[in-house]
Amino acid sequence: MSKIAALQFPTLALSESRLDYYLKASKDNGANLVVLGEYVINSFFTELLHMPKNMIKEQSEAKKESLIKLAKKYELEIIAPYVSVEAKSYKKLCLKVTPNGVKSYEQQILMPYEHWNEEKFFSNKTPSELKIFTFNYEKIKCVLLFGFETHFDIFWQQIMAKKIDLVIVPSACTFESKQRWEELLKTRAFLNSTSILRVNRIGKTKDEWNFYGDTLFINAFGEIESKLGSE
C-alpha cells in the first residue's frame, strides 16, 4: 500500500533540523512522498511584501538546498511550494524534489484580490493553454494544483480526461473558510472521480492571519477519510 506523508507546518526556520526530523519520521513510517503546504519554505505572502529581496533570496536558496540534500539523504520525493527570486521579479512555483533532481510547476492562475494580490506581486505568466502538472508515484497517477487553482473547471476537465487517481493540493487557507474548502474539495473529488490530498499551512502572521490546518484526504466518493486538526 502506497503511503504519502502530509506535513502541516507554519513557515520553517532556516535551520533544517525540524524538517530533517519529520522527513526521517515519514520515511521510517513507509512514506516515499512528502507534501508541504504553501508558504512553509518561505514566509507568508503578506510578510514577503515587506521583506528585502536579498532576505527572500537567502531564505529560498537555503531551503531549496536543504530539500535537495534531505531528499537524497532519505531517498524521498518532496513537494514544496517555493518563491523563486528572479533578476527583477519573483515567481511562485512548486518544487518536486527527488534524489535525482528537481522539477518545478509554475502556478498558472494567481489570486487577484486587494488584500491578497499574488497576481500583482509575482511575475508568473498565465499561458494561453492551461495544462496540468502530472507525475506518477508508485503507479498512482498524480496531479499537482495550488489551492486557488482548484476553483477553475479547466483543470478538472483535464484531470477527468486523463483519469487521474490523486490530486495533491498544497494550500494556505485562512479566515473562516474551513467549511467552504471542505465542501469545495469534496465536490471536486466526487464529480471528477479522483481522490484529493489537501495539505494546508498552520500558524499566525504578525497581522493576525490565522491558518487553521485541516489537512485532509478525500476519496473519490467525496468522503473525508482522514484529516488533521489545527496543530
Place the predicted regions along the sequence by residue.
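CN hydrolase (nitrilase-like) catalytic-core segments centered on the catalytic cysteine
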Residues: 56-79, 151-231
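Extreme N-terminal starter segment of soluble prokaryotic enzymes
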Residues: 1-5
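Cys-nucleophile CN-hydrolase/nitrilase-fold catalytic domain and related Cys-dependent amidase chemistry
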Residues: 20-99, 103-104, 174-187, 191-194
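Short, acidic/polar
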Residues: 15-25, 151-157
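Active-site catalytic loop in hydrolytic enzyme cores
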Residues: 85-162, 176-183
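Hydrophobic residues at beta-strand termini and immediately following loops
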Residues: 7, 105, 135, 199, ...
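Short polar catalytic/cofactor-binding loops
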Residues: 8-14
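Structural motif
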Residues: 32-33, 142, 166
